[in-house]
Structure formats: structure tokens, C-alpha cells
Amino acid sequence: MDKQVNVVNYRELKKIPYILLLLQNGVNDHDFTRISVSDLSKQMGTTPQNISKVLRRLEREGYIVRSSVKGEVSVMLSEKGSALLRNLMDLMENLLGKNITIVLRGIVVTGFGEGSYYISLEGYRRQFISKLGFDPYPGTLNVKLLDQYMKYRLYLERVPGVRIEGFSNGSRTYGGVKAFKCTISDIPCGVLLIERTSHGPEVIEIVAPVKLRDRLGLKDGDDVTINILL
């Protein structure tokens, strides 16, 4: 069955260059990022007044959330803004006839042993099943990215992914997670970008329906290639 693609109308298309500009300056959909209106205006070849006007319009129409404290402006992409970019990506995929894929490479490393606890929490597990399409093995595969692939890791911070919402069990609050569907050796998996983590940005965690170390015979130091489907 063909994938249904939501129509991106002309009014929305006019906003995309400005939203992409924000993404290029570090804005994402899970926390506020401080921006420079002056720098944005130089990058777009327009005036700071026009950029401020555009930001107010994007905020008024619900594409971004904006905060201004002591003259410093911070911006976060809203769910509506993320949805617009997803629709654009779906449209591109439909027109090009293929998926957009980002390839990451790294080596397997030992984690802190926390993955099994967090993945087993029902508040996360239910969302992995409904949003990633599989019941996860209670644990994660930790991969340390090679230096030349870190730029793609940073790119993922800036684009919409699958939002795994945080939750509270009454005694503790658990943070949200951005996920991306991916494959490792044709096994469906999910790359997790975790808001609260003890790892540095060079280490990513992979969730899958099976224990990847056992299924693929992986040990610390082994190379891994991750194909992320946008």
C-alpha cells in the first residue's frame, strides 16, 4: 500500500526556509535554544526587524515556541512545526521514490547497565511498541560513534524524530526521548537520543526487539553500521 502523504500548502511552504534556518542554528523540538536575530538576518540577507517579524508570526501561528528574557531570544520547534517538516520529508520521499537515509558508524562499547531498567518501564515500553513498531528487548546496545560521523549525530538533534514522552510514576519523573527508526543488519531498531543521560554525545543507545549482542555476535570494539530512516 502506498504511503499517504499529507499535502503541504503554499502558505506552509513559505515558512519552511525560516524553519530550516532555525534548525541550522541549533533549534530543535525538545528544548529552548538561544538565537541571535542579527546573525539570522545576515544569513537570510534581510533585516533584523524582518526576522523578528517572521519569528512573531511563526509563534502566533503555532510553529515555534518563543521565549525572551532580558533581551535574549530562545526558540523551540513546536509539534506543529515538527509535523510540517515531517510532511515535507514525506513529500520528498514520495517524489523521489525512496527513503531518506542517514548512515552512522561506530564501535560497540559497554554501557552503565541502566538500559534494562529504563526500557522495562511501562511508560516507555508502551510508546516503543506503538511508535517504533516492536516490543523492545529490556536493554540497549551502546555504540560510540567514529569522529567523522559526529556531524550526523548533531544533525539528528536538529530534525524531528519520533517523540517518546516523559512521564511520572508518582514518586519519580522520567525524561523524554527522541527516537529514530533504523536498522542494523536488517534488524529493525531505534536510535535513542536521551534527554537525561550519563553518556557523552559520542555514544548513542540502540533499542531493538532482540538482544543485538547475541543475535549479531557483537562484542566490545566491533564495528556497527546503523541505517537511520528519516
Swiss-Prot record:
Gene3D superfamilies: Riboflavin kinase-like, Winged helix-like DNA-binding domain superfamily/Winged helix DNA-binding domain. Pathway: Cofactor biosynthesis; FMN biosynthesis; FMN from riboflavin (CTP route): step 1/1. Pfam families: CTP-dep_RFKase, MarR. The keyword Metal-binding applies. Keywords: Flavoprotein, FMN, Kinase, Magnesium, Metal-binding, Nucleotide-binding, Transferase. Its cofactor is Mg(2+). GO terms for molecular function: DNA-binding transcription factor activity; magnesium ion binding; nucleotide binding; riboflavin kinase activity; sequence-specific DNA binding. Binds 1 Mg(2+) ion per subunit. InterPro entries: ArsR-like_HTH, AsnC-type_HTH_dom, HTH_MarR-typ, RibK_CTP-dep, Riboflavin_kinase_archaeal, Riboflavin_kinase_CTP-dep, Riboflavin_kinase_dom_sf, WH-like_DNA-bd_sf. CDP binds at residues 111-116, 210-213. GO terms for biological process: FMN biosynthetic process; riboflavin biosynthetic process. The keyword Cell cycle does not apply. FMN binds at residues 197, 205. It catalyses: riboflavin + CTP = CDP + FMN + H(+). Residues 102-230 are annotated as: Riboflavin kinase. Mg(2+) binds at residues 140, 142. Residues 1-101 are annotated as: H-T-H motif-like. Its EC number is 2.7.1.161. Belongs to the archaeal riboflavin kinase family. Catalyzes the CTP-dependent phosphorylation of riboflavin (vitamin B2) to form flavin mononucleotide (FMN). PANTHER family: RIBOFLAVIN KINASE. This is Riboflavin kinase. It comes from Caldivirga maquilingensis (strain ATCC 700844 / DSM 13496 / JCM 10307 / IC-167). The gene is ribK.
